[in-house]
Amino acid sequence: MASIAHCSGGLVGAGNFDFILGGSDPVGRHGLMELQPWHWCCLPLEGRTGSEIFSQLFGHQGIATLLESPYPASPDHPHLGRYSLCAGQPRKGRLWTPKPEEIFSFLNQLCPCNHDVNLTKNIPEHLPFHGGWLGWLGYDTAWAIEKLPYSKADDLPFPVAYWYEPENFVILDHQEQLLWLATTDQEKIKFFQTQLADKINSVSSPQVPPLNLTYTTDQDQYETMVNQAKQYIKAGDIFQANLTLRFIAKTEQKLNSWQVYQHLQTINPSPFASYWRSPWGDVVSCSPERLVKLEGNVAQTRPIAGTRARGKNLAEDEQLLQELLVNTKELAEHIMLVDLERNDLGRVCTWGTVEVDELLAIERYSHVSHLVSNVKGILQPDKTGVDLVKALFPGGTITGCPKIRCLEIIEELEPVRRSLFYGSCGYWDQRGNLDLNILIRTLLFTSGQVTGQVGAGIVADSDPAKEWLESLQKAKALLAALEGL
């Protein structure tokens, strides 16, 4: 089936989902509503990128999503670049923004194990998304999982959770060079084909005035936070914590978030990148990190811990990498967090199936290199994707170890709540498959400003000044995307 490169135009899938209409009713006042049948079309991809397809089909829509992996992928992670997904506006009534206490009630209703979903046999099973929901879980989702103190506020307008069912979507199979288009209206197939045939018009980048850049935490304040965290480590409360600082960039003219995303993907291509155009603002993320993936009954997480700046040349780059690989502080932090993820997966996976199938791998990006591992296991038969997300969220690499105590300390030390930063976004497929990143290397575009957040892992022998510099290094690619337009 994967070799087909023509339009079938047939009905190939239908199922049942709860009808969710915003707000405070995760179960759905309207009961079950049959999922409209999908009309599928398969076309040659012809080397086009996710960004190009998104621009052609959905770039004009007020609500739209792109989940993009660059292809060919980096030699450091060749298996992470096969698919991209882009989608337009939601089906009528199929957008939901819950309160934190409602999030998992909704996700349990969404989970296919609660519904008689009629899956198509005419579309390749390997495609990651056969229809379902796209969305995010902000950092505050942790408060729906654990009892945590409320002492800080989030002044950004984005809802804690946001999920919607798209009216039309496209899967790009970069490896097979095929484009799979799905729509609820068969007449839309010809319309989209016409759009895809049109030449892509390049958009000239405007001259952006100098950025007015401010940090909500200055160096002295951040180093004080680091020292306070080290006191908690010394007292035995925690072993490691991730502390962040927020920056805000303002200009006299509105920045084009889509141009920023494209520029950021050019200078810092990342396997879990995403672009969200939403009613509350735009989200630009070039995340290198996966929180969780579930495919069938195989669950996996891919923690990143350990960072070095890129060298000015190959020799310096290699020297910095070797320093990273023998640095006892970095290695201890990484292994500690891998163990945390093993334990989290072990809560919902079958005994004896959790394994580290990739340990201390190097992944290189435009401004930094990372140490990365991969942990996987077989989900227990009586567990669902909802249980898996609850076990892993938020990622241990952006909180610390032990996770709950670190969440409490972060709430105490950081001046503002994290909003979407360090939450997750991605897809939840109607078959039960899901793939969520961690929202790092992310910019939030709201009226009049762009906000970013970066941080570093703190351990007992951390140097506060070096942790400050590591955080700034992580911000460089984001700031370069803003300043380089």
Swiss-Prot record:
Gene3D superfamilies: Anthranilate synthase
The UniProt record lists the keyword Magnesium: yes
Co-factor(s): Mg(2+)
Pathway where this protein functions: Amino-acid biosynthesis; L-tryptophan biosynthesis; L-tryptophan from chorismate: step 1/5
Positions that bind Mg(2+): 333, 470
Record-listed chorismate binding positions: 306-307, 441, 455-457
Textual note on the cofactor: Binds 1 Mg(2+) ion per subunit.
Cystine connections: none
Reactions that this protein is recorded to catalyse: chorismate + L-glutamine = anthranilate + pyruvate + L-glutamate + H(+)
Keywords tagged on the record: Amino-acid biosynthesis, Aromatic amino acid biosynthesis, Lyase, Magnesium, Metal-binding, Tryptophan biosynthesis
A Pfam family it matches: Anth_synt_I_N
Homology family: Belongs to the anthranilate synthase component I family.
Note: Component I catalyzes the formation of anthranilate using ammonia rather than glutamine, whereas component II provides glutamine amidotransferase activity.
Quaternary structure and interacting proteins, as annotated: Tetramer of two components I and two components II.
The protein's name in its UniProt record: Anthranilate synthase component I-like protein
Organism name: Synechocystis sp. (strain ATCC 27184 / PCC 6803 / Kazusa)
Record lineage: Bacteria, Bacillati, Cyanobacteriota, Cyanophyceae, Synechococcales
Gene from which this protein is expressed: trpE2
